[in-house]
């Protein structure tokens, strides 16, 4: 189980990313439209003004049940060992077992 502070930090980053999403997206499209280099630098400065934790690259996918940040399966939102346990216990409909 991941520490609660790490899970809270991820939640905070997700909120910040959603808050500043349109600012980042609009400034990125604006950079591509502007022909002059000096204007691009000004827009790039605006792009750097939001907090670092609002960047989508800083988000991690975490396991829904344990909070583990590694070996997550996107389709299920679970880490590998929890997924295996749930499949063996027939808790995930449609998932077939394999000998791994």
Swiss-Prot record:
Keywords: Chloroplast, Plastid, Ribonucleoprotein, Ribosomal protein, RNA-binding, rRNA-binding. It is found in: Plastid, Chloroplast. Disulfide bonds: none annotated. One of its GO terms (molecular function) is rRNA binding. One of its GO terms (biological process) is translation. Binds 16S rRNA, required for the assembly of 30S particles. HAMAP family: Ribosomal_uS14_1. This is Small ribosomal subunit protein uS14c. It comes from Chloranthus spicatus (Chulantree).
């Amino acid at each position: 189980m991941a520490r609660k502070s790490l899970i809270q930090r991820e939640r905070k980053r997700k909120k910040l990313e959603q808050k500043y999403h349109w600012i980042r997206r609009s400034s990125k499209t604006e950079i591509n439209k502007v022909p002059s280099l000096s204007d691009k630098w000004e827009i790039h400065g605006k792009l750097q003004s939001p907090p670092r934790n609002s960047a989508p690259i800083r988000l991690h996918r975490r396991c829904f049940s344990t909070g583990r940040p590694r070996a997550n399966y996107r389709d299920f939102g679970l880490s590998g060992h929890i997924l295996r346990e749930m499949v063996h216990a027939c808790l995930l409909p449609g998932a077939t077992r394999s000998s791994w």
